[in-house]
Regions:
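Catalytic core of non-heme Fe(II) oxygenases with the double-stranded beta-helix
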Residues: 87-141
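Non-heme Fe(II)/2-oxoglutarate
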Residues: 1-93
Length: 141
């Protein structure tokens, strides 16, 4: 049986300031996202949950010939970071089991073309969903 595809989640609006979280995130060292859609290096990320304790290890085993070992999924130190408590609170309202959770940055004035992550085949049957939660954005997005 095919699972229904949700287009919108009824989540409470987060009204607290994210300034501390943004400041903390801006001070981290990010890793460039490995994809042909990032040829100019304008897109990077850190891991909050993934296959490693290393926040710069943002890939999934088997993606783009990565050497990421198949390890149990785990939360990185960022999940318990006090300045990122708002992110933890936002995630707590999402009724799902998480695989990877990443904070991604896109340099101002750049865009990413529409694409899919071919390795996540379970997206088609609704077993995996991708959510994008803007922390800092512009009115043009």
């Amino acid at each position: 049986m095919r699972a229904p595809v949700l287009k919108e989640l009824d989540l409470p609006q987060y009204k607290q300031s994210l300034r501390k979280a943004v400041k903390f995130l801006n001070e981290l060292e990010y890793t460039a996202v490995k994809t042909k859609y990032n040829a100019k290096g304008n897109w990077d990320a850190v891991s909050i949950r993934g296959y490693s304790d290393d926040i710069t290890n943002i890939l999934k085993p088997g993606v783009l010939k990565s050497n990421v070992k198949v390890e149990p999924l785990r939360w990185t130190r960022l999940y318990e970071e006090p300045d990122l408590l708002p992110l933890k609170e936002i995630l707590s309202h999402i009724p799902a089991e998480f695989e990877r959770v990443r904070v991604m940055r896109l340099k101002a004035g750049t865009t990413i073309k529409k694409h899919t992550d071919k390795v996540d085949k379970a997206i088609k049957d609704g077993k995996i969903v991708r959510l994008h939660i803007p922390i800092k954005t512009s009115m043009n997005v």
